[in-house]
Every structure is written in C-alpha cells, then in structure tokens.
From Swiss-Prot:
<feature type="binding site">
    <location>
        <begin position="153"/>
        <end position="160"/>
    </location>
    <ligand>
        <name>ATP</name>
    </ligand>
</feature>
<dbReference type="InterPro" id="IPR036121">
    <property type="entry name" value="ATPase_F1/V1/A1_a/bsu_N_sf"/>
</dbReference>
<keyword id="KW-0375">Hydrogen ion transport</keyword>
<dbReference type="InterPro" id="IPR024034">
    <property type="entry name" value="ATPase_F1/V1_b/a_C"/>
</dbReference>
<keyword id="KW-0472">Membrane</keyword>
<keyword id="KW-0139">CF(1)</keyword>
<keyword id="KW-1003">Cell membrane</keyword>
<dbReference type="InterPro" id="IPR005722">
    <property type="entry name" value="ATP_synth_F1_bsu"/>
</dbReference>
<protein>
    <recommendedName>
        <fullName>ATP synthase subunit beta</fullName>
        <ecNumber>7.1.2.2</ecNumber>
    </recommendedName>
</protein>
<dbReference type="InterPro" id="IPR020003">
    <property type="entry name" value="ATPase_a/bsu_AS"/>
</dbReference>
<comment type="function">
    <text>Produces ATP from ADP in the presence of a proton gradient across the membrane. The catalytic sites are hosted primarily by the beta subunits.</text>
</comment>
<dbReference type="InterPro" id="IPR027417">
    <property type="entry name" value="P-loop_NTPase"/>
</dbReference>
<dbReference type="GO" id="GO:0045259">
    <property type="term" value="C:proton-transporting ATP synthase complex"/>
</dbReference>
<dbReference type="InterPro" id="IPR050053">
    <property type="entry name" value="ATPase_alpha/beta_chains"/>
</dbReference>
<dbReference type="InterPro" id="IPR055190">
    <property type="entry name" value="ATP-synt_VA_C"/>
</dbReference>
<dbReference type="InterPro" id="IPR003593">
    <property type="entry name" value="AAA+_ATPase"/>
</dbReference>
<dbReference type="Pfam" id="PF02874">
    <property type="entry name" value="ATP-synt_ab_N"/>
</dbReference>
Length: 471
C-alpha cells in the first residue's frame, strides 16, 4: 500500500527484512524507499512476503552504514524509470537516475520496469535481413530485423569489441535509436564506450551518442542492481518501439544477469539448482527475453553478448539463452589465437534466416560452399598433422589453400579497434561480401598468398594490397 511505513528488522548483505502493519504489506516487486542517516536514499525491491507483515527485499545500492530500525516507506509501485526523447544522449543507473553529471533528465513520463510482454496478437515476426557491415556475420549468420542474436564466447575472445563495432556501424548506417545495457561488466569498458560514442558522428551535427540511451549496472554494483538493469534498459527501449520506431537493444553481458540472479537467489535462501544456479533461471530469462520482441508498431532488434564460463557451452546459463535466439554468433579461442579478429567460428554460428527464400539463392549458395570448404579443411587437419600437406591430392591442396584464405578474409579492421590495428575500420555491404566470397571460391585470387587476405575489407582491397607489394 502506497505510503505505508515499516521498519527494517534484519540486514544480511544486500538483503533486508522490513516489518509493516499486516494489512499494509507491500506487494511483490514494490519499491521500498529508505532514508539513510547520511541523507542518501536507498531503494530496495520486495522479493518475498514472509507473513505477519514482514517482507524480504533486495537493495539496489550498497547497504553500508545502514542500521536496523530505520524507516522503510512503500512507494506502492515497482521501480519506475524515465522514458521518452529526453533519455537520448544520457547515461542512467538501474533506478533511472542520470549518472553523467549533465543535470536532471527532461522526461514527462515514468514507467515501471516490470511490465508484461506484448500480447500475442500484437506481436509481429518478419524475416528481413539486418545488415551489420561485418563480413563473417552477414554471410554465415545474418541478423534478423526485429530478431534476437547472441554473441557467445569465453573470456577475452572479443565479445565486447564486436558489440561496440555493431553499435558504431548501426548508428552510422541505419540511423536508428540504440539502447545499451551494461550488465555487470567492467566500468573501464563502459567509460571507453561512452567516450567513443561521443566522438563518433553520424553527420556534421549529430553524434552517435545523441541517438543512444545508456544504462549501467557494472561489476562493482550490488547483485540487485545487476539483476534489474537489463529491465530498466528494456523499459526505455519499449517506449521507442511503441512510438513506432525501430530500436536496437544491446546487452553486455546477459550472463551477468544470470549471475546476479544466482547471487540474489542464494541470499534469499532458495535451494540452488544444477551447477549452483538459481531454480528460477528459466523463468527469469524468459521474463526478460519475451519482452524483447517486435510489434505491429515498431521493432526491437537485440544483440546480446553471452559469456561462456570455462568455454563450456553446456553450462545452464548459455544453454538457457540459446533457446531464445534467432541467430548465434560463436567466438572461438583457437581462431583468436591465430590473430584472426573477429574470432567468429563460421561452422558453429547459425541463423534462422540463412534460407534461399529470404537471403536469396546466390547468398545461400556462397555461404554453404564457404562452410563446405572450411569443414573439409577441418576434416583434413589430422592427415596434414601426420603426413603434411604434400601428401594430399591436388583437389584437397586447393581446398586447403582456399580455406586458409577464407579464414583470413573473414578478419576485418574495426572502427572501434583502430588504435590496436592501426587500420581504419571497414564497413562491407552484404552485396559486396557475397560477391567477394563468390570470386574467391571461383579461383579468381588463387595466385595471391594468404597473408594479403588478413584484415581487409572487400576482395578489391586484397588485390590492391597484393599489387602494391609487387611494385
């Protein structure tokens, strides 16, 4: 009940118990406001009703310096965050408070972060390709406009860099609105991303940042904030979708959302499930993923980085995410070890729309032929390791040579990695990608050594680099 006042009776880490009059017990997911002695406001979300007017709540910020006996006020509704054009070009925390030092947000509407997904009859599914400008993704695992894509990888294989490049490409080439949720990742990366977005420009007047909303709940935040920050970003994205816009939602990293849920679950005293995860893992993931959907008014296209613990794809966290996705981009450590970035595994990455009726017969033919050549090269590796390349048939030697060129040609200079590679980023349209790989498969560049294919845009760049070296 709004305005009901209770008293904090127990504090265990970020979980606290508060006692209210029994006929005024706050509802599940209601936000409680607590004024600390230092004048700061602490918000906690009700998770359990224990009976007798006692509720268990999870704090959204640190409980340091909090004492038993302080007053807790029931706001009567879930955490509500600002939505609308005033949020563009701003940086928020889980509560929707600006953290960029730019003053109060100009918002006329606030929405609760817990909302039902759109009704089934309002949802819309399209099978339209979404161009990213990244060759390996556009050819092998094309994104669906209004679909969900997961970027899977272990530690340090380049998930965040791929996400950052997608943000930069999409903002420049597609001129849509983007919402970025930093969930439990490094504050340094978040800071770098904000500065890069401010520097990148769509045109003379408009920065990429001016069309982006950023919401952060980083590694140092309590688990409650990390668990709810994705819902805050989702609520802001839903507003633009419902206004008829096409929105991009980036989540880095969805595994940290699961990890925060696991921490909260343990603090609430729930019995853990397999590998120590929360028993509600599937439900929590479903509640978030079902809201990331397109309606007849507008679309939300989402790209989610998924950390894979110890490179184990059978771990319950990445396995639960898999079932919700239209396309999966798998980053492989062995490819990164060869110095090929983005380290996408073209044999393990998949897309629902790699279908001749959607992408076209030529795109489908080239993609499948590239995969066939790479698979044959993979099958031959044991023979090569034992007997050497010289013992292969002429056909197999040609397959190996082309496969090695394809592997290297899948690498690409990124705009956001310019300071590492020393090369300006390249955006390659899908038509050029398909044409370049078709020419490579046809044997047009069999005479060019494989090292010239590394970190190039289109095939013409490879030919130019080769001819320049011969002068």
């Amino acid at each position: 009940m709004a305005g009901a006042t209770g008293v904090v009776t127990d504090i265990i880490g970020v979980v606290l118990n508060a006692k209210f009059p029994e006929d005024q017990t706050p509802e599940i997911y209601n936000a409680l406001e607590i004024r600390l002695e230092n004048g700061k406001r602490l918000v906690a979300e009700v998770q359990q009703q224990l009976g007798g007017g006692v509720v268990k709540a999870v704090a959204m910020s640190s409980t340091d310096g909090m004492r038993r006996g302080v007053k807790a006020i029931d706001t009567g509704r879930p955490i509500a965050v600002p939505v609308g054009p005033g949020t563009l070009g701003r940086v928020f925390d889980v509560l929707g408070d600006p953290i960029d030092g730019e003053g109060p947000v100009q918002a006329t509407e606030y929405r609760p972060i817990h909302r039902p997904p759109p009704a089934l009859e309002d949802q819309s599914t399209t099978a339209q390709i979404f161009e990213t400008g990244i060759k390996v993704i556009d050819l092998i695992a094309p994104f669906t406009r209004g679909g969900k894509t997961g970027i899977f990888g272990g530690a340090g294989v380049g998930k965040t860099v791929v996400i950052q490049e997608l943000i930069a490409n999409v903002a420049k080439e597609q001129s849509g609105f983007s919402v970025f949720a930093g969930v439990g990742e490094r504050s340094r990366e978040g800071n770098d991303l904000i500065h890069e977005m401010k520097e990148a420009r769509i045109d003379e007047q408009t920065r990429v940042f001016d069309k982006t909303v950023m919401v952060f709940g980083q590694m140092n935040e309590p688990p409650g904030a990390r668990l709810r920050v994705a819902l805050t970003a989702m609520t802001m994205a839903e507003y633009f979708r419902d206004e008829g816009r096409d929105v991009l939602l980036f989540i880095d990293n969805i595994f940290r959302f699961v990890q925060a849920g696991s921490e909260v679950s343990a603090l609430l005293g729930r019995m853990p499930s397999q590998v120590g995860y929360q028993p509600t893992l599937g439900t929590e993931m479903g509640e978030l993923q079902e809201r990331i959907t397109s309606t007849k008014k507008g679309s939300i296209t989402s790209m989610q980085a998924v950390y894979v613990p110890a490179d184990d794809y059978t771990d319950p966290a990445p396995a639960t995410v898999f079932s919700h996705l239209d396309a999966t981009i798998t980053l492989e450590r062995s490819i990164a070890a060869k110095g090929i970035y983005p380290a996408v595994d073209p044999l393990a990455s998949t897309s629902r729309i790699l279908d001749p009726n959607i992408v076209g017969a030529e795109h489908y033919r080239v993609a499948r032929e590239v995969q066939r050549v790479l698979q044959r090269y993979k099958d031959l590796q044991d023979i090569i390791a034992i007997l050497g390349v010289e013992e292969l048939s002429d056909d197999d030697k040609l397959t190996v040579a082309r496969a090695r060129k394809i592997e290297r040609f899948f690498s690409q200079p990124f705009t956001v990695a310019q300071q590492f590679t020393g090369r300006p980023g390249k955006y390659v349209p899908i038509a050029e990608t398909v044409k370049s790989f078709a020419r490579l498969l046809a044997g047009e560049v069999d005479h060019i050594p494989e090292q010239f294919f590394l970190l190039q845009g289109g095939l013409d760049d490879v030919i130019q680099a080769y001819e320049a070296s011969r002068r």
